[in-house]
Amino acid sequence: MSEKKHSCEEKSLQLYPLSNKIRHVNPNISALPSETDISESLTNDLTKLEISNYAPFNRDLETFSDLIFGLTNIQKKSLYSLQLGRSRGYALYSDENEKYLWSINTKITSTEQREVLLVKSNNKKFDTSIVLKHTHLSSKSQNEKKARVKVFRQEIWALKTLSHPCVVQLLNYYVSSAELILVENYCMGGDLYHYTKKHHSDFSLEFVGRIFSELVHTVAYLHSKCLIHRDLKLENILLTQPYNVIKTIDNWKNYPNALIQISDFELSIFVDSKNHLVQSSCGSQEYAPPEVYMGIAHDGFRADAWSLGIVLFALLEGRLPFDSYPTLDPENVRIKRYVQRLVRCDYTWHLCKSPFKRSTGNTNDNDDPSWRFRLFVKKLLKNRDQRSTPTELLKDFNKHGNFTLPLLENVTI
C-alpha cells in the first residue's frame, strides 16, 4: 500500500483527535502519519507548533467526545507531565480558567518501553476514566526513537482498522519529539492474568466459556482483516467489569455486553490474505507455538490460535500448560525440558481432567461438562499443520449453542 506523504512544515507534533463516528466508518489509513513524517517531526522544535483547525477550547463540553478533545494541545498550552504522588498529573490547562481537565489516578503498569496511566476526568459532568499509554522519547537514541515510532504507528493503524466490542477503543493519540501518547478506554476489571491469579477458584465453566467465546470471535474478526495480534496472552486481555460486578452475574449466555477486550496491538501485523506468512518472531514465549519459539517462518493465524489454546488452558487450570513444578535443576536443563514438552504438546490436566476412568468403560463424555473445553485445547495445542484456526473453531461454536453469543451476531467476519 502506498503511503501518502505529509508535509511537517512548521509543525513539530501532530494530533489526530478521534470521535465515535470516525470509529465506525471505513478508516482512511493513508491519512495516518507515515514513519518518515513522524521521524522528521522528531527533529523539529516544539515551539513552532500551530494548530488552528480545532474548535476553541473554552467551548461548553456537551459530550464525551468533547471531553476527549480536552487532550488536544490548543493555542499556547500543552500537556504537562508531573510526578506521580502530586495532586495533578497529565492534564491540559484551559486558557480561560486555568483548570485541569484530567488528573493521574494511578500508574497501572510501567516498563522500559512505556508506562500505562489511569487518568480521571475532573469534569463533574463526566465521571469517567481513560487510559494513557505514554512513551518517553527524550532519553532514547535516534534509532530507538524510530523503532518506537514504528511500533506506535502500527498500533494506531491496527486500532483504526478495527471496530469490535471486544477490542479496546482508540480515543486519541499524540506525537511529539519528546513523547508518544495513546489514549484508550478504561476496562475496570483489569487484565485477565491478575484476575485469574486472584479469583481462579471462583471461575465457573460458564464464565470461562463466555471469555473463550468472545476471544475466538474477536481473533477470527482480526484475521478477517488480515491482522495478526502476535501477543495474545492473559495480560493483554482486559475485563470490562470488576470482580464485585462479575460475581453477581449468573447467566453468561445472555449477558448483553462485552466481558473482555483485547489490547496491546504493538506487535500486530497485517499479512497477505492468502498465506498469512510471518517471517519474524515476537511475543511472549510462554504463549508462542513451537514454530515461533524456533524462529522459523510460520502461519500467523495458526500462531494466534496456539496462543488461544494456552489462554483457555490457563483459565481452566489456573496455570500454563508446559510449566513444570519448581525443581532444583539448572536453568538450561529446565528450558530444554520445557521445549521438549512444547514440541510434543505434552501437557497434563489436573483440575479439568475427565472424571471417568476409561478402564471402566464409562466413556459417556456428554455427562462431563468440561470435555468440550478439553477438546478445544486439543485442537489448538497441536502441530501447526493440524491446528485449528479461530475461524474454524467458530464453525464448531455454531454446532454447539452454548458457545454462540447474541452480542456478536451483528459483527461481520
UniProtKB/Swiss-Prot annotation:
GO CC annotation: cytosol
A family per Pfam: Pkinase
Tell me what reaction this enzyme catalyses. L-seryl-[protein] + ATP = O-phospho-L-seryl-[protein] + ADP + H(+); L-threonyl-[protein] + ATP = O-phospho-L-threonyl-[protein] + ADP + H(+)
Q: Which InterPro entries does UniProt cross-reference here?
A: Kinase-like_dom_sf, Prot_kinase_dom, Ser/Thr_kinase_AS
Q: Where is the active site?
A: D231 (proton acceptor)
Enumerate the GO terms in the molecular function aspect: ATP binding; protein serine kinase activity; protein serine/threonine kinase activity
Question: Binding of ATP: at which residues?
Answer: I108, T109, S110, T111, E112, Q113, R114, E115, V116, K133
Name the UniProt key words of this record, in alphabetical order. Answer: ATP-binding, Cytoplasm, Kinase, Nucleotide-binding, Serine/threonine-protein kinase, Transferase
Location of this chain's protein in the cell: Cytoplasm
EC number(s) per UniProt?
A: 2.7.11.1
Q: What is its main location?
A: cytoplasm
Q: Taking every annotated instance into account, which residue ranges of this chain make up the domain Protein kinase?
A: 102-403
Q: Which Gene3D superfamilies match?
A: Transferase(Phosphotransferase) domain 1 (1.10.510.10)
To which protein family does this belong?
A: Belongs to the protein kinase superfamily. Ser/Thr protein kinase family.
What name has this protein been given in UniProt? Serine/threonine-protein kinase ppk27
This protein's species is Schizosaccharomyces pombe (strain 972 / ATCC 24843) (Fission yeast)
Top-down, what is the taxonomic lineage of the species of origin? Eukaryota, Fungi, Dikarya, Ascomycota, Taphrinomycotina
